[in-house]
């Protein structure tokens, strides 16, 4: 449900997208509302095998998060509806002023038999930046979720990585109102050696993919591992794939470029589009 105007005013920018299935006309009806410099594209139809499946690109007109700004987005995919949501480009968090943290809050609700492919670009935190991201998913057990995220350090005049002050990623997934995933990543390189073994292992980018669907089984975990090793045997990265307690899995990648993270996530995404939807790989046509 869209926030009241009084609550919307608490945020520097707000974006709301709702997608519902119009059975009478066999199409996806949508509602989009935004304020200030947070935007969404009109629905794009990039899935050539599914011409009624809309794709929305979220757009930050301000160029990035300035110290202390708080953004919020609410996405609803109703029963039997489906859509793709992606960012237009990387999100950027700049130098914190007066110790203030920039924040992004995203709340996503998935109804019965709904499908959401939420493919977000990386978050880049620059020197002296402080950024926190909070993602809350509430999904029906019959819904399908494919979600990606990534973060990495921005350019520094000193030429070294890990110059940001804080990077915090908090993701919660509720499955039939039960908390089934709580991913809590907090990086403070001025307090801890983030490049150390057991944290980032010397890599700069950390990517995550979550896939939840009733048809995900243990064999898929093994298959993804084998496909990645087969396709990128010499890539400088490390990755892991684990099955969740519900029908789903998580993929995590550590690499030195976002390009490498994207490539690994694409292996899993392509595999599940074939298995779950009988579709070809998704081409988002972003530069």
Curated annotation (Swiss-Prot):
It holds the Pfam family UreD. It is found in: Cytoplasm. It comes from the Bacteria. InterPro entries: UreD. One of its GO terms (cellular component) is cytoplasm. Keywords: Chaperone, Cytoplasm, Nickel insertion. Signal peptide: none annotated. One of its GO terms (molecular function) is nickel cation binding. The keyword Translocase does not apply. UreD, UreF and UreG form a complex that acts as a GTP-hydrolysis-dependent molecular chaperone, activating the urease apoprotein by helping to assemble the nickel containing metallocenter of UreC. The UreE protein probably delivers the nickel. Belongs to the UreD family. Required for maturation of urease via the functional incorporation of the urease nickel metallocenter. This is Urease accessory protein UreD. It comes from Ureaplasma urealyticum serovar 10 (strain ATCC 33699 / Western). The gene is ureD.
């Amino acid at each position: 449900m869209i926030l009241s105007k009084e609550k919307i005013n608490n945020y520097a920018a707000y974006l709301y997208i709702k997608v519902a299935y119009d059975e009478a006309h066999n199409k996806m009806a949508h509602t989009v509302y935004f304020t200030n410099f947070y935007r969404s594209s009109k629905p794009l139809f990039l899935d050539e095998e599914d011409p009624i499946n809309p794709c929305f690109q979220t757009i930050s007109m301000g160029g990035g998060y300035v110290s202390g700004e708080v953004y919020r987005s609410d996405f609803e995919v109703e029963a039997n509806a489906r859509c793709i949501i992606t960012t237009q480009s990387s999100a950027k968090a700049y130098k914190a002023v007066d110790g203030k943290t920039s924040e992004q809050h995203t709340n996503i609700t998935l109804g019965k038999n709904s499908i959401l492919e939420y493919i977000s670009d990386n978050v880049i935190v620059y020197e002296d930046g402080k950024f926190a991201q909070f993602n809350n998913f509430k999904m029906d057990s019959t819904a399908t979720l494919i979600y990606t995220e990534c973060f990495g350090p921005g350019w520094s005049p000193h030429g070294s990585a890990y110059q940001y002050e804080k990077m915090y990623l908090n993701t919660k997934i509720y499955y039939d109102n039960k908390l089934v995933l709580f991913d809590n990543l907090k990086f403070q390189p001025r307090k801890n050696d983030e490049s150390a073994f057991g944290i980032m292992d010397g890599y700069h980018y950390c990517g995550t993919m979550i896939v939840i669907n009733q048809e995900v089984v243990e064999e898929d975990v093994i298959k993804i591992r084998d496909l990645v090793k087969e396709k990128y045997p010499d890539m400088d990265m490390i990755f892991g794939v684990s099955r969740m307690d519900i029908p789903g899995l998580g993929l995590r990648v550590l690499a030195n470029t976002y390009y490498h993270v994207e490539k690994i996530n694409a292996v899993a995404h392509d595999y599940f589009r074939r298995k779950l939807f009988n579709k070809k790989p998704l081409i988002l046509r972003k530069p």
